[in-house]
Amino acid sequence: MNQVAQQSFAEGSPKIESEFVEAVERSELRHKPFDHIYMEGLFDPASYAELLAAMPDRRFYHDLRHRDALRKDGSSTRLRMYLYPERVKRLPPEQRRVWLPVARALCSKSLEDAFKRKFRAALEERFGKPVEQIGVYPIPILLRDQPGYRISVHSDVPTKAITVQFYLPADSSQRNIGTIFHEADQGPGAEKTTQMPFLPATGYAFPVSLTKSWHSAAQTTEADGERVTMMVTYYVADSPKTWFKWRFRRFLLNFGWHPER
């Protein structure tokens, strides 16, 4: 095994976390069609190869029964696995060694703070207070979207504060299946788009705006293949009650309960 990758995924190693934070910090804040960043170099090449080689088996995923993801026969084109550290500990030893530092990084306060700093203006405009006072709860997931997956134009639900998605393709051949940003949800504005390149060790993030952050994913084909991504969504947790709600939902995963969102 490559020594660089071994050091990156060492249990308790801050390297993955710091690489994520640095990727956020060096990313340019773009304002069109809405505030967002496109991150590159999220992993060094050796670590990225190690991550893909340790992709969890399908038995650890469950169907996400979202309306846009369902086939006519009722099955889902989107497979989801939660990346909370306690869920990752169920994996076989080699997969666990690689994915546990990633899971911890996605749930880290330093990564949360990096996104808050980057999107300070938009978040403070929406919530009417300093970002330091905006409570959020991270929900990290690993996704394997099967051919036929699509999602229509939407801005994300009000319970979300920040949406983040990391792309995990094997190479650049899937470049054209990245998320599409729109200027509006319908009419001419919906046709004015910006697409995020679906490239190795890249990703995007944006602060959720109920009137601006319109995005979609075009339906994939058999030729496109499987679309593998990793997400962390920061849900609004501005009170002890809402924080407990997200924490309790996390606890219920231990008993096989899987929410639609």
Where on the chain are the PLM-derived regions?
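Active-site rim elements
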Residues: 37, 96-110, 150-151, 189-193, ...
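Short, Φ-rich (hydrophobic/aromatic) sequence segments
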Residues: 1-12, 98-114, 163-167, 233
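Catalytic cores of PAPS-dependent sulfotransferases
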Residues: 28-33, 39-57, 107-122, 145-146, ...
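A contiguous catalytic/ligand-binding core that recognizes phosphate-bearing ligands
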Residues: 120-136, 141-162
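Catalytic core of Fe(II)/2-oxoglutarate
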Residues: 2-3, 148, 155-161, 168-261
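N-terminal auxiliary "cap/dimerization" subdomain that precedes the catalytic jelly-roll/cupin core
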Residues: 1-81, 255-261
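Hydrophobic residues positioned within well-ordered beta-strands of beta-sheet architectures
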Residues: 39, 138, 162-164, 230
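Signature of the catalytic double-stranded beta-helix
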Residues: 79-138
